[in-house]
């Protein structure tokens, strides 16, 4: 196939460094991810290579120009996410510019992949949403950001954050200390995310007033959760009975988000409540299932490689077990 060449010009009034990144970091990241040569000189960018890739690069720079014109600067990490969206058939990558929450530190929390964007859209448009996927895909963090945003907009009157306490067998009465002291180690990931979004003093005040509640799943039994945004984390560690119990706590003007990763179950010798729930509820109106993939992992790049390595190991182990069974 004959190579294609184009030349792009950074629009007048835009600093090229906003488009190319500090030290041309965006440019270098781009060249590592496309089958095309990209050369920048001054306010001009020349692209040469596979025609489809050249077109992809042109669409990427159209997005980068719009971001720069709006005062935003892409980072090298943004490049792969934008390209993934464009390769997925989206006309442009503006779908990722969907601010969920402005944290008290002034940091904008938004979806960073197309999968995360679809997950956020599912939560917004459904009463109950299941977010399923590996570690690092933002399942819980984005759900909590949407919950905090809903509370700030007075769409709900309270937040309830919960998870099963498998490590303690949920028999917290046998542990020493106050209830808060007993559950704190198991709830710490939820606290950490919450304190990343809201001022610590304000959060403590809302918790004292009962506007924000963080509690083990066992403490949801017998309640009706109305006018609330409820997030159930680590749902792969629920039993089928616990999952049914939780889902039937739904009250009026409430939204439930259930997050989990079936590859990280801590239940031993028991079937989890997340295993069959999609088969049971998959056709129920107003219930959504959002599946996040390895491509949606946005933690340190090494996390994605770790998840991939474990998946490959598990697949190989299952294949060996299957081969042994077939040889008998």
What are these regions (language model features)?
Residues 83-99, 315-328:
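Intrinsically disordered, low-complexity linkers and terminal tails enriched in Pro/Gly
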Residues 13, 51-52, 237, 297:
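Short, surface-exposed acidic/glycine-rich loop or hinge patches that mediate macromolecular interfaces
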Residues 44, 104-116, 120-232, 236-328:
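Conserved helicase motor core of SF1/SF2 NTP-dependent helicases
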Residues 39-96:
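Interdomain "pre-motor" coupling segment immediately N-terminal to P-loop NTPase/helicase cores
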Residues 32-39:
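A short, structured beta-strand/loop element
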Residues 19, 57-60, 243-246:
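Hydrophobic side chains in well-ordered alpha-helices
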């Amino acid at each position: 196939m004959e190579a294609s060449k184009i030349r792009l010009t950074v629009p007048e009034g835009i600093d090229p460094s906003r488009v190319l990144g500090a030290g041309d970091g965006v440019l270098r990241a781009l060249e590592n991810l496309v089958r095309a040569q990209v050369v920048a000189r001054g306010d001009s960018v020349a692209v040469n290579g596979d025609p489809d890739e050249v077109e992809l690069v042109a669409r990427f720079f159209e997005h980068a120009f719009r971001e720069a014109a709006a005062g935003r600067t892409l980072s090298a990490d943004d490049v792969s996410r934008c390209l993934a969206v464009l390769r997925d058939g989206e006309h442009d990558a503006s779908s990722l510019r969907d601010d969920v929450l402005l944290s008290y530190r002034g940091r904008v929390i938004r979806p960073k992949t197309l999968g995360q964007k679809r997950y956020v859209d599912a939560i917004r448009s459904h009463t109950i949403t299941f977010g399923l996927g590996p570690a690092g895909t933002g399942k819980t963090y984005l759900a909590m950001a949407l919950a905090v945003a809903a509370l700030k907009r007075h769409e709900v009157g309270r937040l309830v954050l919960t998870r099963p306490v498998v490590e303690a067998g949920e028999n917290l009465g046998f542990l020493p200390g106050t209830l808060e002291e007993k559950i704190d180690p198991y709830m710490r990931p939820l606290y950490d995310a919450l304190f990343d979004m809201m001022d610590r003093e304000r959060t403590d005040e809302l918790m004292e007033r009962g506007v924000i509640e963080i509690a083990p799943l066992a403490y949801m039994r017998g309640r009706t959760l109305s006018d609330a945004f409820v997030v159930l984390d680590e749902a792969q560690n629920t039993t089928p009975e616990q999952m049914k119990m939780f889902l039937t706590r739904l009250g009026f003007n409430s939204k439930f988000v259930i997050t989990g990763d079936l590859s990280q179950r801590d239940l031993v010798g028991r079937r989890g409540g997340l295993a069959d729930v999609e088969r049971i509820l998959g056709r129920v109106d107003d219930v959504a299932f959002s599946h996040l993939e390895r491509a949606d992992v946005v933690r340190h790049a090494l996390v994605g490689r770790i998840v991939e390595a474990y998946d490959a190991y598990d697949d190989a182990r299952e294949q060996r077990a299957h081969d042994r069974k077939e040889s008998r």
